[in-house]
Amino acid sequence: MEDNKMKKIKIAQIGIGHNHGADKMNTLRALPDYFDVVGVAESDPYWYNARHELGAYAGLPFLTEEEIFAIPDLDAVAIETDGKYLISTALRCAERGLHLHMDKPGGEDFEGFRKLCRICQEKDLAFQAAYIYRYNPALKFCMDAVKNGWIGDIFEIHSVMSRDDSKNDAYRQWLSQFKGGAFYIFAGYLMDIILLMLGAPDKVTSFLKKTRDDALIDNGLAVLEYPKATATVRVSVAEIEGFNYRRFIICGTEGSLELCPIEAVASEYYTRTLQVRMTLKHPRGPYAAGTHTVDCGPLGGRYDRQLIDFAKIINKEMVNPFPIEHELQLHKTLLEACGVPV
């Protein structure tokens, strides 16, 4: 990268309580051409004691939030607090004119999220929600195929994002604080892709269930209705080897697309080639009619593409491909499915 082409973004991280916080920091520090990481803050003693010695934060100063705000020429903040503090923290940052990369979901207070979006628009701040499936190369192939009309008019989408936390009692207890339980935490990844393809649904109907007699909704289904299509979103944290069977299926009048798994597992996570099974009624692009296995390449760095885009958006080198209006509609749809008033 040429020095005269992009200004390095001076960035700090507020919060280490989000489960993606350490990986996010590792990525920021691995992109020194784009980011100058100047510090980190965590006001919750529980999360500070649990995670401040992680290697991701080695050598970085732990500061108070006010000390971070006082850093000269600070451009942006990555907000990685525990989920219940994301919006309140983001609002304080936005009010100070800082560009925001915020982990997800965006809180159960929809009016707070709406206020955040409004401030970002008024102050011309970059706002990036950390939904990483939108950068998944196989799902990007699917979205491009849909956009280019390869599979005709969509009439059905089936999506699943599950995992097995049957023995992870601490995580199950943490999930139970949210009205939608596990569905609240994971369904937004899938809804994001659906809304990018089909837009806002006409109606959202959800079925939120428990596999155990405890406080956690650990098995959820939402049906998004459109004039000529339905899309289902399933989330469970009780599916044995559920990560292996995360999937996205799109059916159209002239073909279909199927991705399973959405992400590779374990040691192959970053390196295994993701494959889409595509069936076409007519020849499209370089593909003949019929069924194809399309190699879409490996995931690579989970957050690299997204954070590089964040820097480019701040520097006005690109327009945010996921505008505030989309983020607002996505969060509204998620909260509706979780039974949260919006």
Regions found by a protein language model. Give the residues of each.
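Predominantly a Rossmann-like dinucleotide-binding segment in NAD(P)-dependent oxidoreductases
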Residues: Y133-D213
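Hydrophobic residues in well-ordered beta-strands that form the structural core
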Residues: M102, F127-A129, H158, L259
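Contiguous beta-strand/loop segments that form the cofactor/metal-binding neighborhood of enzyme cores
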Residues: M191-A266, D304-M318
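C-terminal helix-rich "cap/oligomerization" subdomain common to oxidoreductases
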Residues: M1-K8, A41, A76-A78, R305-V342
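C-terminal glycine/acidic-rich active-site capping loop/insertion
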Residues: I132, I249-E325
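N-terminal Rossmann-like dinucleotide-binding module
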Residues: E2-A56, A311
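Rossmann-fold dehydrogenase core element
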Residues: K115-Y133, D153-E156
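Beta-loop-alpha module in the N-terminal Rossmann-like domain of NAD(P)-dependent dehydrogenases
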Residues: Y57-I119
